[in-house]
Amino acid sequence: MRDIKAIESVVADGLANQGYEVVDLIVQNQGSKKLFQFFVDKEGGINLDDVEKASRLIDSIIEMENLIEGAYILEASSPGIKRVLKKPEHFKKFIGQRAKITLKQMIENRANFTGLIAGANETEMTLDDGTTQFKFKYEDIKKANLDPVLEF
């Protein structure tokens, strides 16, 4: 099996030609097989038909490029409402939205921050928790997700 980043990159390039973005790839052991979970999106949002189409495209890319050896399980899904934020473009796209940020190392005796994405550029993002604006370099972020407040 190729490196996970290489698999993600090849699949992302193939899907980009069809207007889809690979937001994240999670690989887990599932018994004797590997489970590959691709989270995909597109401009304007993704629906069930898009997910099915993306799944078929991912499967054909994996087979054509011989990316994975042996038996595997493939899942394609939308990123969901708590979608992961990995690239500067993700943070820029969701300026004004609520997010939860987990840092690799603690600052001010904490590693978790929640607030609105107040800004983003190529090297860092700004999070406003209502009282303070924090600037975090992307390289210092361990995990970032949208964290919407759901009202019923």
Curated annotation (Swiss-Prot):
The keyword Cytoplasm applies. InterPro entries: Ribosome_maturation_RimP, RimP_C, RimP_C_sf, RimP_N, RimP_N_sf. Disulfide bonds: none annotated. It is found in: Cytoplasm. Keywords: Cytoplasm, Ribosome biogenesis. Its main location: cytoplasm. Transmembrane segments: none annotated. The keyword Cytoplasm applies. GO terms for biological process: ribosomal small subunit assembly; translation. Signal peptide: none annotated. GO terms for cellular component: cytosol. Belongs to the RimP family. Required for maturation of 30S ribosomal subunits. This is Ribosome maturation factor RimP. It comes from Elusimicrobium minutum (strain Pei191). The gene is rimP.
